[in-house]
Every structure is written in structure tokens, then in C-alpha cells.
Amino acid sequence: MIKLYFKQAFHLLKENKLLSSISIIGTALAIAMIMVIVITLRATIAPFAPESYRDRMLIFRYAGFQYKTNENWQSNGPVSYKTAKACFKEMAAPEAVTITSSFSETMLAAKPAGEKVSCSVLQVDDDFWKVFKFDFLSGYPFDKATFDAGATKAVISEDIARQLFGTSDVVGKTFLLNHSAYMICGVVRPVSKLARYAYAQIWIPLSSTDAFTASWGEYGIMGMVSVYILAKSQDDFPAIRMEAERLRDRYMEGYPDYELLYRDQPDTYFVAAQRYSANNPPAVKQAVRQYIICLLYTSDAADEARS
């Protein structure tokens, strides 16, 4: 019976080769487009190492800072470490809270008297390794004592280790990062660039650089750090947001003439991916609309090709 179906199909294809070719190519392109959309969505929101807990993550990257009596005066951007620590680190509801530099930075790494290698560096705190799940090939992440001391230790990816030393067995060795000496405490498997908030090739303590105290604007409220919150469950999201508001209000009691605007943050992972600037709302509806239109269009195109 199955052989008969195949014979009938081949017979129909031979009757009109041009229309059959158009139908097959159109259907294939439609399926390919749907696969691209699904893969894009999966890369945007589906958990994968080291962002293994995307579904339980809340993200705070930008804030607004303004006079209460003059809303026309406003600063927008990332906050300082001082602000992030006061407003988020004392939270009781989450499983973990990490503060990192807002963006990875390109630096030059080298062995003493060796060739320089350009690499992506992210500055993080000790809780970073609780929020993001890295595959350590050797060694370990730096701990709270290391972070509090501002020690110059680093976790590096396997590919950078091989570029610098010719081997991945480098725990305990020292290298130069923008001319500052760092000791390697751990080596991890290379991270995909699709892991937008965890990606780097070298991770160092935020406290080992001036980013720890860097700020701009009035009173050191604004700076260059982001906050990533790991909830115990998605059900805890409302409680975490309420606690964030309470800590923000307590912090701003010291600055009675100003407001710190969260603009509906912290965001879920998908919403954060649609927030492109500090002072504009995330384009969530537009993103969802685009995905739906693309799916409907490709579905219609496939139907037309088959007909």
C-alpha cells in the first residue's frame, strides 16, 4: 500500500515538473523560515548553560534618576555598585543576586613577556557563579573572601587558556590583563555568544578594578553595573518585585529630593531581551507581533506552494 502511494506521488510530480518544483521549493522555504523563527526564539528565551536558569531569572539593567520637582531633569542608564548593593543585595526572597559590569570589555591578555591576546572580559561578584551555571574543567570560581579583598584572581575559558599557555592546565598560573597581574583560579568550557549576559572569555572580580567604585551623575547613584536575580520559583517574582520596591524606597530616603525610576523592572528574561535602552519601554508587543506575522506568512506561503 505504501509503495502504491509513492508511485502515485512520483507520477503526479512527473506530470508537471515546473509546478511540482515550485511547490516543493516553496514548502521547503516555508519550513526553513519556521525553523529559523523557532531557533531564534529558543536562543532568546530557552535555558542553556551557563544561562541555565533563564526561566527563574529577573534582570535589572537600567534606571532613571530625576528631581521630584522637575521631571524635565533626568539621567538614564545603569546604576552604580553602591546603589545596586543597597537596593538588591539585601533581598531575602531570591535564591541568589549577582552584580556585574553592564557590558563585557575588550582587554589584552598575555603571559609575562608573551604575545598579547584580545579577549572579552566581564567583571562579576562572587554570587555570579550561583546565578549562572558554568562547566568548570579545572579549579574553582573565586569566593566571597576573594571578592571582598579585591584580589586579582580570574576564571578563564579553555580556548583563552590554550592561546596563552598552549594548554588548559593553567590553574595557579599568572597572566597579565591590561598590564595587571591576575592569577587563574578556574578554567571553564567556552561560552556561546548567545548567552548574552554571561558571555565572556575571562571573568574577574568587580572589586579588583575601578568599576567597583565608578559612578556618574549626582551622589554616585548612577554607574555601570547590572543586577541578575535568581528566584527560587517563578511564583516568587511578585514578592521579589515588591521587595525591590521597598529597598529602593528605603535607599532613596537618603536623597529626599530625587526619584530612582525602575520602569517596571526587574524584567523576565524575554522582556529584558526586548529592552533596548534606558529610557524607553521594552518592545514586547512588537516582538510578539513580528513572530506571529512571520509564522502566519510562512504558513500561508506553504499552503499556496502546495496548491
Which residues make up each language-model segment?
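Short, conserved clusters of charged catalytic residues that mark active-site
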Residues: L4-Y5, L19, I39, A43, ...
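A short amphipathic helical element positioned immediately N-terminal to and/or at the very start
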Residues: Y5-K14
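Membrane-proximal extracellular/periplasmic loop immediately following the first transmembrane helix
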Residues: I37-L108, E115, M222-S226, Q234
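Short acidic/polar micro-motifs at solvent-exposed secondary-structure junctions
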Residues: A63-G77, A86, T98-D127, P141-K153, ...
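Mid-to-C-terminal secondary-structure elements
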Residues: L122-F142, T152-V284
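N-terminal membrane-entry
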Residues: P282-L296
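Conserved small/polar residues in nucleotide/adenosyl-binding loops
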Residues: Y297-A305
